[in-house]
Each structure stands twice: as C-alpha cells, then as structure tokens.
Amino acid sequence: MKVLGIESSCDDCCAAIVENGNTILSNIKLSQKEHKKYYGIVPEIASRLHTEFIMYVCQQAIISAQINISEIDLIAVTSQPGLIGSLIVGVNFAKGLSIALKKPLICIDHILGHLYAPLLNHTIEYPFLSLVLSGGHTILAKQNNFDDIEILGRTLDDACGEAFDKIAKHYKMGFPGGPNIEKLAIDGNQYAFNFPITIFDKKENRYDFSYSGLKTACIHQLEKFKNNNAQITNNNIAASFQRAAFENLIIPIKRAIKDTNIKKLIISGGVASNLYLREKIKNLEIETYYPPIDLCTDNAAMIAGIGYLMYLKYGASSIETNANSRIENYKYTKGVKL
C-alpha cells in the first residue's frame, strides 16, 4: 500500500510517499526561511506559505517516488496539534485530494508521527521508552504498541526546543536556535555558567521536565553582561545552556528506566539530532534508537508510516474531520494513553 503523507503543522511544508509503513519512496520538505528575521515562527506567514507550496511538495513527492498519482492508495495528513492556520491548509488540501482521487483519508496526530519516526529505519520490539523533544513538545512515554502509548512525564512549561529558540533569540544567535546553539557550544566552556537544573521529587511529577527556570537564568545573565558592560560570550553561554538543558532530561529518564525495567529508548523530534545530547544519552548504557537526521525534524514520511498502521487497524477518518491546534480527545497528561 502506497501512502501519501502530508505534514504542515508548523513552518515546514512536507509530503512523502511511503510503502507499507516503512519503505520511504520519497520525502520532500520545504522549510520557510522567511521566519529567520523574526527569530521565531509567524503563524500568518506560515499558513500563507503553506498555501503556496503544498501542491508543489506533493507533486515533487509523487515525481520523486516515480509513481503515478493514481497509484496512491491512502492519504495521511497531520490534523493536530500545531498552528491552526498551517494545519487547516494541510487538512483541507488532503480532503480535496481524497475526494478527487476517491482515496481514503486518515488524520494523524503529530506526536504519534514523531513517536513512529525511529521505526522507519529500526525494528524495535515493544515495549520501549520514548522521548519526544521538539520546539512544541517534551514528552516521556512508555510505548506498548504503535497505538498504545502511556505518557509518563512532560514539560510543565516550555518545551526543550522552545527554550533553545528563545535563548538564541535573546542572544541573537540565529533561528532556529537548536542548531546554532549546538554549533556555538563546540568552542565554548560548558561549565562557564552554572545554570539551574529543575528536578521534581514528588511522586506525581518524578518524570516531568521544566525549562522556565533555566531559560530565565540564562536571560538574566544577558542583563548582567549589559549592566557590567561586559563582553557577551555566546560560545560559553551556548555550551553552558546546552549542558543544563540536557541534564534536565537525564534524571527523569533514569527514573523511568528503573521503575519500568525497560532498557530500550527511542528519541525523536528536532532536538534529537543534537550530537551533544546523543553523547549524554550514551552514558545511560541502554539500547537507544534515533531516526535519521532528516527524520528528526518535522517530515511527512513519519505521518505516512503511522498513517498506514492506523488505517489498517481503525479504517479511514471522516471527511468531516477538522484540524485542531490542540488535542480534544485526550490531553498530554501523565497516565493517559494516546
């Protein structure tokens, strides 16, 4: 079964053709450079550019896969969560294509896509622990199956990737923040600044994360530089922030490993491409799996892949399904299964 995947939940306009859930025939992505001067995503600009590009990326996905449009068996599209304007463009285009081609439609949760991404290039036996690290989400979960996912912990404020973007904006390191901070950190001293690490000891929060304190402390350091007319050392700031940001993750992960006795971990989302993080995770001495670098960030291959499995088990979505910026049928809270 050949699945056309469409992903437009934020600023990346993506389309892919995936066969039988794991054979990627094509994977096309257009990133919107227009947001760089704003040091962040401007929703109105994002949705307008999706309108301009979505037909093109779908055409390129079909051409690159060397198939005819009539060979598409299923259309999978991200319908939640994300920027509502961007989601609407993708969902409405997918609906129109579904009607025109008389092909079934399956609407997919963006987080389920990220959770599935490592399975596109790895065969991993369930159960395993999953960590999603992106600009919008920081979630630690236990996966018993592709559709049986128990949330153990989540960020209580900023997402990990969001914190990287905000620090990069304040220090004018460029956008997106993650890759730029990682690059600057290479030539920095990670112990130059002792930024705080937030760990929760209460039972109900033992797997949770927080980045607001770290973000605030890092921004306050910038004010200290200015007040003292001191030279701003972006390399040291980047290295110290990056170290603290990832140490924030380690203790909740260690707790989950101990409590569940699961020795396998998959990590996905844009932040998963960070090489410093991967070195830190190696110290856990457990089986760890990542998607290829191009599948860490938003992409349509992961949507097509999980869409195939969801369709086989649950059938097609209603053509009346609408885009949702947030989740209506469940919340990202501890103990809730997706």
Swiss-Prot record:
- BP term (GO), one: tRNA threonylcarbamoyladenosine modification
Protein location: Cytoplasm
Question: What domain of life does the UniProt record list for this protein's source?
Answer: Bacteria
Instruction: Give the EC number.
Output: 2.3.1.234
Annotated binding of Fe cation, by residue = 110, 114, 298
Which Pfam families does the protein's record reference? TsaD
Question: What is one term from the GO cellular component aspect held by the record?
Answer: cytoplasm
The entry marks the following residues as binding substrate, namely 132-136, 165, 178, 274
Enzyme class of the recorded protein, top EC level: transferase
> Is Transcription regulation a UniProt keyword of this protein?
no
Q: Which cofactor does it need?
A: Fe(2+)
Q: Which UniProt keywords apply?
A: Acyltransferase, Cytoplasm, Iron, Metal-binding, Transferase, tRNA processing
HAMAP family from the UniProt entry: TsaD (MF_01445)
Q: What is this protein called?
A: tRNA N6-adenosine threonylcarbamoyltransferase
Q: Which organism is it from?
A: Borrelia duttonii (strain Ly)
Q: Which gene encodes it?
A: tsaD
